[in-house]
Amino acid sequence: PVEKQRPLFLYGPPGIGKTAVVEQIADELGIGIVSYSMTHHTRQSALGLPYIKTVKFGDEEYQISEFTMSEILASVYGYIEETGNDKGILFLDEINCVSETLSPSMLRFLQYKSFGSHKVPDGWVIVTAGNPPEYNKSVREYDIATLDRVQKIDVESDYDVWREYALKRNVHPAIILYLDVNRQSFYHIENTPVRMVFVTVRGWV
């Protein structure tokens, strides 16, 4: 059942098509997709803004802190209202780059699918993605507590799979011919004394 689904964590180098895979799945299933890069989020935008609410317990009134709806969840509900599509994927990219102040809330979100009192809508699943630390200086390694809350899938570049995709996308034959002969050039990242030199799968399309 969707409500029991552990969030997926697609883990692999940059530019190999993690986002494209999620978008293709959503398209083929005819479901919605809302994408966010977590590097762009502060604690306030992810969790919502605090405000004071008056509540009554018995005969007494008290002021308590509440939070507005998370910008992330609000986008999902907005998508449903706009399209009428109540099933979809909430895709959170660069999930292992969240700030230290946001990490505890993200840990809770991965387990309970909620920010504060606001939950991910029924019918929506969470898919996340991230890069290994050697490719991104902002990455924070996941500990056991976090990994226990997600279903980790290692994603690697595969030229033969990409070649089939490239033919369907009408990638120029000269590019495919070149890579047939020079497969070592398909995906390459190298740190030189001067700068980082790289070519990724994304760069060939």
Language-model regions: role of each:
Residues 1-181:
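AAA+ P-loop NTPase catalytic core and its hallmark functional loops
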